[in-house]
Amino acid sequence: MTDLLGDMRRTHTCGELRVTDVDTEVTLMGWVQRRRDHGGVIFIDFRDKEGITQIVFNPEVNPEVHAKAQTIRSEYVLGVKGRVVNRPDDMVNPKMVTGGIEILVDELKILSRAETPAFQIEDRIEASETVRLKYRHLDLRRPKLQQNIIARHTASRAVRDYLNDLGFLDIETPFLTRSTPEGARDYLVPSRVNHGQFYALPQSPQLFKQMLMISGFDRYYQIVRCFRDEDLRADRQPEFTQIDMEMSFVGEDEIMEITEGLIKTVFKRVRDIDLELPFQRITYAESIDRFGIDRPDMRFGLELNDLSDLVENTGFKVFASVVKKGGLVKAINAKGCANFTRKQIDELTDFAAIYKAKGLAWVKVKADGTWQSPIAKFFTDDEKKAIEVRLDMEKDDIVFFVADNPKITNEALGQLRNELARRLELIDNNTYRFVWVTHFPLVEYDEGEKRYQAIHHPFTAPLEEDLEKLDTDPLNVRSRAYDMVLNGIEIGGGSIRIHSTELQEKVLNTLGIGKEEANDKFGFLLNALGSGTPPHGGLAFGFDRLVMLLCQEESIRDVIAFPKTQRATCLLTEAPSKAAPAQLQELSIRVVNIEE
């Protein structure tokens, strides 16, 4: 049998008592971390989310309580009363904030017993993630995870405080809405009342926040759940949280300034880190040119260099033919790394192949300044000199080359840049480098669909100076979109929106969405745009990713209380599950087994 709580109430947490509290009578409640018996005296590390305090059961102080304590096991929930005393000098633990004291217990209540846990409740855990997620209620007792969840709460409060002070309104938008094309699959919810019709869970509140701007609420925000039925990675979840913002009568500069202040506030509140403002800004074109990708990690160099103009007439036909076909030849100089072995080079070649590179050429600069490489013989001395100057090549350097169409060349070398930085330990994990990437292309061409698709979403405004290209050269139309990138991870993105019905219809038409389809899917927006729409824009931060980086975790699953697996399942509750036949009948749904 367990004890009832009765009128026992906690006076302190397990992380707050110090030597200044000696001789104080206290009541603590929490979990048994571990138990030790020494010469008949029982010592217990007693834990709650605030910390650990050592409690002591001495048979000479209270034999009855001591006898009861002998039944205690790990993860039992206890309530204890006792007196704070100094630890003996040889038992002081300077690694614990409570390490100078212990509680001499004279009253004990066993509030709940526990079976042997599936794993030890410690930060150094050997259990697999599958086991941890199945027993998430135990996993969440670990100090590190509890600190992450508390940091998430602190970040959320900081966001609300900052935006409230700037006159933003926290306005809720619907979860049951209609399906719109936003790049990923929607989660559909069948309507019981309207048979054969479905709601969609929102991938973002995009259209509703634009409606709020049209309605006159000129500063809006939400910390809101969003849903996307997509293939998952370490930084993706089917349901995720974003900080969603929108403002009227603003341009890019004002939005960036406000959001930089928001991020500065969050970092100060959660990590006591003072960020320098403003953040660096580069265009999309510059990011691709220098780093190969649109989410560059700015904590290290290893920038890409374009050699196409130097090799278009070289004797090395692999390079020359690529340039003549409109491709690119680019290179990275890994300074001082000519000691790379053949095995290491082969590993990097295989890595580049993941991103469709057909090969990875390389050149080592020997101590005498000459080239060591299978391709060295194809270049004249003048060509070598020009390449050396362009790449700042010196003895003991190794240079890696990729030659292919622009997309493959940039992507493969951009990812290789990150891989080299990891291997060479160039990344300082205690450094936070932010950069805005601006002026993204408005659209890209989807070869499978044989039509243009919006890079961000269909409501992003084009740059005014590129409007005339919308009909004739849409791939070269730049947008008023911007992403915030932190340490190579996109944590937020937004844009100035289209606030003209005519321009919105024109952009939709460019995307292959004719008037009839546009009215069917976006008629409410198009009608609203004609009601007097202020210029407006905003952005959304991936809150889970932001907290992941703040907590220096590798996966957002470690900063979400109850995350899904990479197969979008909840191992704790075994969701998703089959619906009862009666439920399906109410919804007029029949499940058909499809053989894969």
Curated annotation (Swiss-Prot):
ATP binds at residues 228-230, 237, 490, 542-545. It is found in: Cytoplasm. The record marks 38 as: Important for tRNA non-discrimination. One of its GO terms (biological process) is aspartyl-tRNA aminoacylation. GO terms for cellular component: cytoplasm. Its main location: cytoplasm. PROSITE patterns: AA_TRNA_LIGASE_II. The keyword Protein transport does not apply. The keyword Iron does not apply. Homodimer. Belongs to the class-II aminoacyl-tRNA synthetase family. Type 1 subfamily. This is Aspartate--tRNA(Asp/Asn) ligase. It comes from Desulforapulum autotrophicum (strain ATCC 43914 / DSM 3382 / VKM B-1955 / HRM2) (Desulfobacterium autotrophicum).
